[in-house]
């Protein structure tokens, strides 16, 4: 009878899936769902599967309320967040929960590895700890139940933890470690060296930590970057306040702290210089690029958002497609919205005879250093240039 009750409880679980949930910060996502859900719930085993965020709940009323939350939350891009709820068996961390005796042994082992003076916990190569192996206890931190048990003990026994060493544990993903932001939020040093992490994307799962020191050497992800600067830049995207990476001091991060209550003053249009140059630049802007078309591009290399990919597809017959093309923006700039910072210019005026001395004319050679390269304009002139550089007469044979 008791076993039947346990089996029934194992079946009373619901899986909650948020498509493209990987785009959102875990804390923001869960707080948004909790605040919009009419029934309080406790998420269990939060993790990511490809680009989806998933967790489990056991209460049927909470599952029903979560269905009602779907499409009621908007992200920063004003896109609705979809939530799917389905019946499921108990999550892995619940079905394979450590027994009380195993939890007690794990706690004793972690106590031995804790440095009180430095508030540091050394869990490197934990699976092969002699005390655990002597009692046939397998603590494999890649398994969510083992990582969940470890974080639970950490929260209860080491609330002031500052340094955590997870070196050499064959970690290939950090789903189980994502709860560290709630269980041990004060951690400043994290050692993940000599593991199996293949992508810096995994670090996004623990980016809620305010890390000052991080170790990643010995992971496959370290060889995926073209150079050291690209490596440092990618890691700092997750941890902006990082000071040391793999034991090396990093330059102090540049952090611009602007009070959100202050409104930045608008840029005032100003032009000083030759009116001739102003006219030439204006002509250049009228004909130079087609930036307005970029937002409607269907180039997969440019457009990554799946929502926009679906939104921009046109499932119509030929006449409708023509209508779609006619709806594209015209190739015309809004000149009132354009500000040009001309920081480099060279002007040469040269003498180029055509048929003979009677047809000698002056030409103005204008070189503009633009953002994507050097642009050269050659224009007829009635005489030597009045622009800053002296005229250079050149005779063609």
Curated annotation (Swiss-Prot):
Domain called NTF2: residue spans: 280-367
Coiled coil: none
SUPFAM superfamilies (alphabetical): L domain-like, NTF2-like, RNA-binding domain, RBD
Function (record text): Could be involved in the export of mRNA from the nucleus to the cytoplasm. Could also have a role in polarized cytoplasmic transport and localization of mRNA in neurons.
Gene3D superfamilies with a match to the protein in the record: 3.10.450.50, 3.30.70.330, Ribonuclease Inhibitor
Name of this chain's protein: Nuclear RNA export factor 5
Source species: Homo sapiens (Human)
Chief localisation class: cytoplasm
Keyword RNA-binding: yes
Cellular compartments per GO CC: cytoplasm; nuclear RNA export factor complex; nucleus
Gene Ontology MF annotations: RNA binding
Location relative to the cell: Cytoplasm; Nucleus
Protein family per UniProt: Belongs to the NXF family.
Biological processes per GO annotation: mRNA export from nucleus; poly(A)+ mRNA export from nucleus; RNA transport
LRR repeats: 160-185, 186-209, 210-237, 238-265
Alphabetically ordered keywords of this record: Cytoplasm, Leucine-rich repeat, mRNA transport, Nucleus, Repeat, RNA-binding, Transport
Superkingdom of source: Eukaryota
Transmembrane segments: none
Subunit structure: Interacts with NXT1 and NXT2.
